[in-house]
C-alpha cells in the first residue's frame, strides 16, 4: 500500500491546484481532459521507483545515511557506514528518514524525495508559467520540463541534485513573479519571502551552492541592466531573517556536537571541491556539452531558436527582463560547473527548468506546420535509432562489454533501449499529426508523454545492470540459501566499499585498508576500520566465523595465499565470502 500512497497523494494535490487555476480553453483542453492527462503523467512518473534496485554509488549512500538516522535516533550528525559523514547537509536525509519511519525501508521510499520535489517542480512550472506568460505557455513549459530527458532521469535517481534543483527553481520562478510588471507591493513582498525561503532550503539540501548560484545570477543581471532600483524590492531585512531562521539552526547544532564539522564542510566540501580535483570528479572543459544537448531533448530544436532571441529587450525601461534573466541563469550555471574542478552529470540539472520555459515560448511562437515538421524530424531520428538498435543491438552491447561488465548482462539492456526509442518515436509521430489537426498544446503534451515514457523505460533498462551496479542480488541470493546474515558476526569490506551493501545488509561493514570519503570518520573513530590488509588477515584467520566482501581480483590473490574463505556468492564485480 505504501508504494501507492505517494502517487495518489501527489495527484490529489495537483488536481486541487489545477481545479483552482483557470481553465485552458484556449489550449484545446477542458479541465477534465487536463486532469486525465495529469493522472496519466502522475502514474507514469511514479511507476518504477520501487522496481529498480539501488545503484552505486549515490543511491546506496543516500539511502543508507537516512536508514542509520532512523536506527540511531540522531538526526543532527549524519553517519554513513556508522562513521561521521559531513559532505552534505541533511534535508534530504531527513525527508528520506521520515519516509522510512512511516512506510518502512524500500526503494520507493529511498527515491520519493527527488521524485516528488521534481514532480512539484513540473506543477509549479505550469502554475507560474501561466501567471507570467499566459496559459498556453504555462502548460507548454510544464510539459517540456516533465518530458525533458535530463530532468526526468535525474528525478528518478536518489541523488541530492533533484531536490536542490527544485528549490532553486522555486526561487527562480518566485523571483520572476515577485518582480513582474504589475505585481502589487504585497505580492512582491510575499514572493520575495518565498525566494529567500527557497534559497535557505537549497542550502540545507546541498550547501552554499544554494545561495551562491542565485546570488551570482542576480549580480550579473544587475551589472548588465544597471537596474539598481531592483535592490529596493528584494526585502533584505525580512528575507535574510527568514533565510537564517531556516538555514542556520542545523549548522549550529552540528557544529556544537562536532568540532571538526565547520572546517571539513566549508573548506573541504566547498572551496576544495570547486578549485581542486581532490574529489576525483574532474572532466574536460566540454564535459557538460553532450550532457546538456542530450538532457535537453526532445526540446533542443526549440530551445536553440529561443536562445538566439532571448537577449532582446522587452517591455518598458526599468521592468524586469525575464528572458535575459533566464538566459543568464542557464548560461552561468552551465559555465560555473564547467570550470569547476569537480564534475558530475547531475550538477547542471538546475539549467533545465529555465530551458523548458525557453522551449515553451518558442513553441507558442512557431506556426503549427513548423512544429509538425520538427516533430516529424524527431520521429525520423527516432526511427533511424530504432533501426540501428534492432539491427546492431548485439554489436553495440559487445562494444560496451568487458570483464567487469560481461556481454551476457549488458545485452539485456538492448530490448529496453529499443522499447524506449519506440515510445519516443510514437510520441513524436502523434505530436506531428496533432500539431496540424489539434493545435500546439495537444502536440506538445503528446511529445512530452512520449519522452517521459522513453525515460522511464530507459531507467528500467539500466536496472538490467543491477548485478553490476548493486549488491541486491548477491545479498538476496545468499539469504535465500542460508537465511539472514548473523548481525553479531563481523562483516569486512576489503580494499573496497559497495555503497549499496550496508543498506541491503541492514548493518555497517568494517573497512579494511580503504579510506576515500571516510577519512574524517575514520580519523574520529579509527577503531571502526583496519588500516592494513595484513592485519585483517590475522584477525580473519583467528575467527570462528565472519563475512567479507572483496573484488574478484583481490579475492583470487588473497585466496591463492591460502587464507581460509568460502565463497557464498559472486558476480563480475564482487565476491562475498565467509570464514568457513
Across the structure, where does each feature detected by a protein language model lie?
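Cationic, low-complexity basic patches in intrinsically disordered or flexible, solvent-exposed regions
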Residues: 7
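Membrane-embedded architecture of ER/inner-membrane glycosylation machinery
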Residues: 20-24, 193-197, 306-580
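Membrane-integral, polyisoprenol-dependent glycosyltransferases
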Residues: 11-13, 18-372, 502
